[in-house]
Amino acid sequence: MRILLTNDDGIHAPGLQALEKIARALSDDVWICAPEYEQSGASRALTLADPIRVRKLDSRRFAVEGTPTDCVMMAVQHLIEGGRPDLVLSGVNRGQNIAEDVTLSGTVAGAIEGMAMGIPSIALSQSMNYFHDEIVAHWETAEAFAPGIIQRLLEVGWPADVVMNVNFPALPPESVKAVEVTRQGFRDGHMRHMDKRTDLRGRDYYWMGFTAKASQPAEGTDLRAVYEGRISVTPLHIDLTHNETVHTLKGVLGGAPPRKVGA
């Protein structure tokens, strides 16, 4: 089995090293194509206004000056020799990718691009506990459980237009409670904010900030599973259509387009 690895934390990220260990537990045919620089929050961005440059680190390891989506496209179309990959693994991300964050995630986007190119794809993320003074990433947890989960998923299979999103709780392996197949959750509070600061020349600038606060996630969601110490496996569908609203709107907007009132 030929496996392509990518991420959004960059070619030197410890999570990519963890992912390589995971992949090599499954196959000896592993290729790595990751961003030269961190691309967290890049989502499915493409590099359109600049040339994409590639640095070859060894025969099967490449750093790309671009996004995770660029990396997967570049690897499949130009860099991998002898055939397309059978599996794309994206991660292991430093921090969870659950709930509404999946639409921002470059890690999930790398898996989506693999799916778009007809390759079974899985995103993997390692949660961290931001409520503690010392934030620790338990890469050993992802390394311990990911190979078995991936193998089981490959045995069962999944639809061609679905990607698997796997999140490991912020716990050492011996404290993980179970694996749970979940749906995508939604937080009950907005966590992002813009932090305004002033430089030494009196000019304002801003940093994107995140508020670490507890949520009350619904049963069966990725949020609930990870918060309670379980591994979350969520099948994600690229079709974002809300079918209930489609049904409602058809009764209101079907037929001739409405004109402005009073026109």
UniProtKB/Swiss-Prot annotation:
<protein>
    <recommendedName>
        <fullName>5'-nucleotidase SurE</fullName>
        <ecNumber>3.1.3.5</ecNumber>
    </recommendedName>
</protein>
<dbReference type="Pfam" id="PF01975">
    <property type="entry name" value="SurE"/>
</dbReference>
<dbReference type="GO" id="GO:0000166">
    <property type="term" value="F:nucleotide binding"/>
</dbReference>
<dbReference type="InterPro" id="IPR036523">
    <property type="entry name" value="SurE-like_sf"/>
</dbReference>
<dbReference type="GO" id="GO:0004309">
    <property type="term" value="F:exopolyphosphatase activity"/>
</dbReference>
<dbReference type="GO" id="GO:0008254">
    <property type="term" value="F:3'-nucleotidase activity"/>
</dbReference>
<dbReference type="GO" id="GO:0046872">
    <property type="term" value="F:metal ion binding"/>
</dbReference>
<keyword id="KW-0479">Metal-binding</keyword>
<dbReference type="InterPro" id="IPR030048">
    <property type="entry name" value="SurE"/>
</dbReference>
<dbReference type="GO" id="GO:0005737">
    <property type="term" value="C:cytoplasm"/>
</dbReference>
<feature type="binding site">
    <location>
        <position position="40"/>
    </location>
    <ligand>
        <name>a divalent metal cation</name>
    </ligand>
</feature>
<feature type="binding site">
    <location>
        <position position="9"/>
    </location>
    <ligand>
        <name>a divalent metal cation</name>
    </ligand>
</feature>
<feature type="binding site">
    <location>
        <position position="93"/>
    </location>
    <ligand>
        <name>a divalent metal cation</name>
    </ligand>
</feature>
<dbReference type="InterPro" id="IPR002828">
    <property type="entry name" value="SurE-like_Pase/nucleotidase"/>
</dbReference>
<keyword id="KW-0547">Nucleotide-binding</keyword>
<dbReference type="GO" id="GO:0008253">
    <property type="term" value="F:5'-nucleotidase activity"/>
</dbReference>
<comment type="function">
    <text>Nucleotidase that shows phosphatase activity on nucleoside 5'-monophosphates.</text>
</comment>
<comment type="similarity">
    <text>Belongs to the SurE nucleotidase family.</text>
</comment>
<keyword id="KW-0378">Hydrolase</keyword>
<keyword id="KW-0963">Cytoplasm</keyword>
<feature type="binding site">
    <location>
        <position position="8"/>
    </location>
    <ligand>
        <name>a divalent metal cation</name>
    </ligand>
</feature>
